[in-house]
Design a protein with these regions (language model features):
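Non-transmembrane regulatory loops and terminal regions of cation channels
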Residues: 1-136, 154, 183-186, 206-460, ...
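Cytoplasm-facing ends of alpha-helical transmembrane segments in multi-pass membrane proteins
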Residues: 139-148, 183-207, 466-472, 530-550
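Cytoplasmic-side transmembrane-helix entry/capping segments in multi-pass membrane proteins
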Residues: 159-168, 483-492
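Membrane-interfacial alpha-helical segments at the cytosolic side of multi-pass membrane proteins
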Residues: 173-178, 496-505
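C-terminal "tail" modules appended to repeat-scaffold proteins
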Residues: 485, 495, 730-731
Length: 744
């Protein structure tokens, strides 16, 4: 039960309170004064509650959170505490800790190497240590689900599949934890380890949307997968018929097309047509068709999910306006039918309480103060928060003012873009000189090299970089110089280069013919020069912002890193689950070789499984790639994802474990190399296309902006904002907020 009356009830209660106050105002004396003080106190509490509700709704809109939570004063305080930075940090830390336990639990990953020939575990945790840490994390998660359930209420809890699943996962993990302790940590299969990635998944709304889109996309691509399976079946049957008389031993072991094609082509020219047709249809037609379908289907489902986020933002902003209108109607003592405007001062009070970025807050407050009237309409209130979608253009400090005309002209010259172009040209010339020196000394032993050319060139260019830095500080001032990220990058590298050059001069003196001193101090001359050359190569990156297309690619890359967090999180979940399952299925299945320190483990292995045939696991020396612990399993899965060596692992685990182990590797191939890689390509395309379109927009073309594009911003042009009627209807269906039903 809520401790405060709901909004609809407060409106009627306030009218009764106002009527009672008017009756008592006719009387005089201390009783009348106390009544007015009591009414004033109640009014102040209501106004504070409305402002608090509006601030929370706006914060929900900024973070794309639902507003269907409790709105009484106590619940709002709990709500803001739950979403505070400290509370979320504790929750995220608990998720990180419980995921990291897999590295320390049996089988422990605390060994110098995962190589089967030399692997020796340094330390195994005693029973109860990791379980105790896990219990603390589970208790935090239980508190988390209890707080969420209370804030949403029972009705919303029943509608939330994620909260129900969260509760079930916690219950299963707790039961499995109790079973582990009762068996003294000796059980082989721990179900809760497979369930742990769910805690990471449910903590991110964007990750949940991406997962939902993945789940809905998979059935759509089954037709292409069936076509791909039919393609494999058809060509397998043709190969069995075609190569029946040709005794080709490698055909039963190799699966890479080119390795099969070359020996077959040496026997008969026509055999190459089979392999060309197989790779052309499978690799270039069906796989690219699969990429297109995954991109199209996932983009459609992601659009629908992002549409929900846009509705949440609009609903939060409109909900804040509606509760502020109730506050205004209570002040005037009128019914809710006149809730059309909000006082500007009230809006400013709300904005001061909202937790948001300082740049956006300052701009929104500036826009609110610019209103000519004292009242803000719903449309104006919504327009205020359009600033959240706009680029925040960085304002630079003013240039220093010089009184002498000569200094003013110098300032104009050295603050021009021409100085940047000259600087880029000088860095390019410096790189050419370094390249010439490296080519010249490539075949010369270090003891016979002459450092005169490199020393003179590097010293001269470092002096130029210092001069360029000083002139920019003169033109822009120290604050203006430091306000540009490119200047900070150049200045830092220039200072490091100057320190290296000075240390070289102090230790080895000035460059001269035949300059090749011995080692003195921490670095030799050649190591100092090599480090300086590496920094100069990094300094050449300053050219990126000055080339439009290159800058576009670079900014797309940085935005991609930010927006990939949700999709990378899903990949982490997949890695975690497959690694745990791999450890359960394949731990200690592959024996170490006979001449290793762990050779005693091979005593019970059939000699038929041991082979040094070319291209096998044993012959290639893949001993570090195994599933004997969690860390080794992660690395093995990564190798399978990025390296085309599937046949090696399919062969070895079919021999030592079971032929059915191939299903595990095929499933990982579908998840990693087919689905996730194609989603990665789709996100790159969306990000780059959106950046390309914006790069030709006339606004902000010549200004440096502090804009980081989110996934919602990427798809904003393809989304529709809800109508006012739709928003009001959704607000009236709020389980804890009862607005008046008067006309707007």
């Amino acid at each position: 039960m809520e401790t405060e009356p709901l909004l609809g009830r407060r409106s009627s209660s306030w009218q009764k309170l106002a009527a009672e106050e008017s009756r008592r105002s006719d009387s005089s004396g201390p009783r009348s004064s106390s009544s007015r003080n009591s009414s004033s106190s109640s009014s102040s509490q209501l106004d504070d509650l409305y402002i608090q509700q509006a601030a929370v709704f706006i914060e929900d809109a900024i973070k794309y959170r639902t507003i269907n939570h409790r709105v009484d004063s106590r619940s709002l305080r709990l709500y803001r505490w739950y979403y505070s930075a400290a509370c979320q940090w504790v929750l995220n830390t608990a998720i990180l800790v419980i995921l990291a336990l897999a590295f320390f639990e049996k089988p422990s990953s605390l060994s110098v190497t995962s190589d089967l020939r030399f692997r020796q575990v340094l330390w195994e945790p005693p029973c109860g240590l990791t379980e105790g840490i896990e219990a603390i994390c589970l208790l935090l998660f239980i508190v988390d689900v209890v707080v969420k359930s209370y804030l949403l209420g029972w009705e919303e809890f029943q509608k939330s599949k994620w909260l129900i699943a969260y509760t079930l996962v916690l219950a299963a993990s707790t039961v499995d934890w109790i079973v582990s302790l009762s068996l003294f940590c000796e059980e082989r299969i721990r179900v809760r380890r497979i369930l742990r990635p769910f805690f990471l998944l449910q903590n991110s709304s964007l990750m949940k949307k991406a997962f939902k889109c993945l789940r809905q996309t998979i059935p759509q691509i089954t037709s292409v997968m069936l076509l791909l399976a039919l393609h494999l079946l058809l060509f397998t049957m043709i190969a069995m018929l075609l190569f029946t008389r040709v005794q080709v031993g490698y055909f039963h072991d190799e699966v890479t097309v080119i390795y099969l094609m070359i020996p077959a082509y040496s026997r008969r020219r026509a055999y190459s047509l089979f392999f060309i047709a197989f790779s052309l249809i499978g690799t270039y037609l069906l796989m690219n068709l699969l990429t297109a379908i995954i991109y199209n289907q996932f983009r459609g489902y992601l659009l629908s999910s992002i549409q929900t986020s846009i509705i949440r933002r609009c609903l939060g902003i409109r909900g804040a306006f509606e509760v502020l209108c109730c506050e205004r109607s209570n002040k005037t003592g009128r019914s809710g039918s006149l809730r059309v405007t909000v006082s500007t001062n009230t809006v400013l009070q709300v904005l001061q309480k909202v937790k948001m970025s300082s740049a956006h807050k300052q701009e929104i407050i500036k826009q609110a103060k610019a209103f000519t009237h004292d009242c803000v309409t719903a449309e104006q209130f919504r327009a205020l928060f359009d600033e959240l979608h706009k680029e925040t253009v960085k304002e630079y400090p003013p240039k220093p003012a010089y009184h002498l005309l000569f200094l003013q002209k110098l300032q104009t010259v050295f603050s021009h873009r021409f100085v940047e172009y000259v600087g880029n040209l000088m860095v390019a010339v410096h790189l050419v000189c370094i390249f010439v020196a490296l080519v010249h000394d490539a075949e010369t032993p270090i003891s016979q090299r002459d450092g005169f050319f490199s020393g003179v060139v590097n010293g001269s260019f470092v002096l130029y970089y210092l001069l360029e830095m000083a002139l920019k500080i003169f033109a822009f001032g120290i604050k203006g110089y430091c306000s540009y990220k490119s200047n900070l990058f150049d200045g830092l590298l220039t200072i490091i280069l100057m320190i290296l050059q000075l240390s070289s001069l102090v230790q080895y003196g000035l460059p001269r013919r035949g300059w090749n001193p011995e080692l003195h101090g921490l670095l030799s001359l050649w190591e100092t020069v090599r480090l300086a050359n590496m920094l100069i190569v990094f300094r050449f990156l300053r050219i990126i912002p000055n080339i439009k297309l290159m800058a576009l690619v670079a900014t797309s890359l940085f935005d991609l890193i930010k927006n990939l967090r949700a999709f990378a999180g899903i990949l982490v979940v997949a890695y975690y689950v497959f690694a745990i399952v791999g450890v359960v299925l394949f731990k200690d299945k592959i024996p170490p070789p006979q001449n290793s320190t762990n050779a005693s483990l091979t005593a019970n292995i059939s000699p038929a499984n041991l082979t040094l045939q070319c291209g096998t696991y044993e012959q290639l020396g893949y001993w570090p790639n195994n599933f004997n612990d969690f860390a080794a399993a992660l690395v093995t899965l990564w190798d399978l994802m990025v390296v085309n060596n599937w046949q090696v692992f399919l062969d070895v685990y079919s021999r030592y474990a079971s032929p059915w182990s191939k299903l595990y590797f095929v499933a990982w191939w579908l998840v990693s190399s087919v689905i996730w890689v194609n989603l990665f390509v789709a996100l790159i395309l969306e990000n780059f296309i959106h950046k390309w379109d914006r790069s030709y927009h006339p606004s902000f073309s010549d200004q440096e902006s502090e804009y980081q594009m989110s996934v919602q911003d990427m798809f904003r042009d393809d989304l529709e904002e809800p109508t006012e009627e739709d928003l009001l209807e959704r607000l009236r269906q709020h389980p804890h907020l009862h607005l008046p039903r008067g006309p707007v």
